[in-house]
UniProtKB/Swiss-Prot annotation:
Glycosylated residues in this chain: N42, N70, N208
The protein's name: Transmembrane protein 81
Disruption phenotype: Mutants develop normally into adult males and females. male mutants are sterile, whereas females show normal fertility.
InterPro entries: TMEM81
Ranges where the Ig-like domain occurs: 80-173
Function noted in UniProt: Essential fertilization factor required for male fertility. Part of a conserved trimeric sperm complex with the essential fertilization factors IZUMO1 and SPACA6 which bridges sperm and oocyte membranes during fertilization by binding to IZUMO1R/JUNO on the oocyte.
GO biological process: one example: sperm-egg recognition
Keyword Transmembrane: yes
GO MF annotation terms: protein-macromolecule adaptor activity
Expression across tissues: Expressed in mid-round spermatids.
Organism: Mus musculus (Mouse)
GO cellular component, one term: plasma membrane
Topological region Extracellular: 26-223
Transmembrane helix listed as a keyword: yes
Length: 259
């Protein structure tokens, strides 16, 4: 046993001794040392978080010396997430309304490069795709002129690239249509008297129920008008007194002359 162990140790030492000689023979060929490759040296993120977007990349030739040469800039399409969630809308029966599936990136490329498909889950707000049925529309818009209660539901818009039918966007629209007599969505009519005064520019203290007072500029105008009225009344009284005294003095002197 001891003899076998000694032999194993001696062979290991001999292998270690010849290892540098083996490594010396593994030289990199001169052709590979001069090789040049194209590498992406800079890249931006996608311009949108969902749907079709764009990213920018800079690609350069890099050699063994690490110097960048012949760099090119390119703008590429990208899709981080093609499902874009839901938008909610509440309208009143009889109103005109439109759903729009377009985005700035689609408009930049041109809507003719895309295919638009709509599906509808009538009468319910949901993203469960099993509830949707085909809806006859192949444009990026759905218009309601006017909208009726049976138009309520969830509309799903799918956008595909025509060149390869790749899905690049899915957007849900939750549409609620209320009866005209159920609720009044008129902002002005829903305000209290104090809120209407505030909306017109009055200053109202809603905490203690104090009477509303005019804004600063209106208070200045009111004060100026008040001062003018008071000054006019006082001036009129003084003029009346002066005239009365003048008339009284003339009558007295005439009487004394007659005497």
């Amino acid at each position: 046993m001891k003899t076998g162990a000694i032999v194993f140790i001696l062979r290991s030492l001999l292998s270690i001794t010849y290892l540098p000689l083996v490594l010396m023979t593994l030289d990199i060929p001169e052709e590979l040392q001069k090789a040049v490759g194209r590498v992406i040296v800079n890249a931006t993120g996608c311009s949108v978080t969902c749907g079709l977007g764009y990213k920018e990349e800079t690609e350069c030739e890099v050699g063994p010396d690490g110097v960048r040469r012949n760099c090119t800039f390119q703008r590429l399409e990208c899709v981080t997430n093609w499902i874009c969630g839901m938008l909610h809308f509440t309208i009143v029966h009889g109103k005109t309304f439109e759903l729009n599936c377009l985005s700035s990136d689609i408009l930049e490329k041109g809507q003719e490069a895309f295919r638009f498909t709509w599906r509808l889950a009538r009468g319910i707000i949901s993203t469960n795709d099993e509830l949707f049925r085909p809806f006859r529309a192949n444009s990026p818009f759905i218009g309601f002129k006017p909208a009726y209660e049976y138009n309520a539901g969830t509309y799903r818009c799918d956008v595909q690239l025509l060149k390869n039918l790749k899905f690049v966007k899915r957007l849900y629209f939750g549409l609620r249509v209320l009866p005209p007599k159920l609720v009044n969505l008129n902002f002005q009519q829903s305000l209290t008297e104090d809120q209407k005064l505030i909306d017109k520019g009055w200053e109202v203290n809603l905490d203690n129920g104090s009477k509303p007072h005019l804004p600063v500029w209106q208070r200045k105008v009111t004060s100026a008008l008040g001062i003018g009225i008071v000054a006019g009344v006082v001036g009129g009284v003084l003029v009346s007194v002066a005239v009365f005294k003048a008339l009284g003095g003339t009558d007295g002197s005439g009487g004394r002359t007659r005497l």
